[in-house]
Design a protein with these regions (language model features):
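Extended amphipathic alpha-helical scaffolds
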Residues: 1-190
């Protein structure tokens, strides 16, 4: 741990984790100042190798909330159906616009991301990763100095964290998730 001698913060063994990626040899092992996880990157065209990304951490889903009550919608003509579909599309656009207004270009969440919202985010240069467990959510927030967000509509600029780099590596398909996402050069790597 020569690399960390003289660090201005207390470093404990609890601040370290070891991830085996199955790539390379022990000589290629390295220490990162951040967090690494295995999650599926949603698309080959997702942004990669982000430099100085702004990081947004969301505890739940990024999608329109499901109704808790059963509702029946009666549609008597195609115009009514079109307006219903348009209203849903506008709600999704409002969610993606709210996220993009924060200037975050790396977003992680504990739940699912609606595919239409995911498409808009990716098209705008935002790497969005879904399905993190609560421990991963807390680790990403800790190392990037982000505030974990519970409601997308309550996001403000003070909740956004940052990192030095975010990159992902896709491995050949198998029965396991093989994408390795690395958040490095973080302001608070512990």
């Amino acid at each position: 741990l020569e690399v960390l001698k003289g660090a201005d913060q207390d470093i404990s063994t609890e601040s370290f984790g070891m991830i085996k990626t199955g790539m390379g040899t022990q000589e290629r092992s390295r220490l990162i100042m951040g967090f690494q996880m295995r999650k599926r990157v949603p698309s080959e065209s997702a942004p990669n190798n982000l430099e100085n990304p702004n990081v947004l951490v969301i505890r739940g889903d990024i999608k329109i909330r499901k109704m808790t009550r059963t509702a029946e919608v009666r549609v008597s003509n195609s115009d009514e159906l079109d307006s219903f579909i348009e209203a849903e599309k506008e709600r999704k656009t409002k969610i993606s616009d709210k996220i993009m207004s924060t200037s975050a270009n790396f977003v992680v969440c504990g739940g699912e991301i609606d595919r239409d919202i995911l498409y808009e985010l990716s098209r705008s240069g935002v790497l969005a990763i879904q399905g993190l467990d609560s421990s991963e959510i807390e680790q990403v927030a800790l190392c990037t100095n982000s505030v974990v967000v519970d409601s997308i509509m309550d996001i403000d600029q003070t909740m956004i964290g940052n990192a030095g780099t975010v990159s992902w590596t896709r491995r050949p398909s198998s029965d396991q998730v093989e994408d390795i996402i690395e958040i490095d050069n973080c302001p608070s790597p512990g």
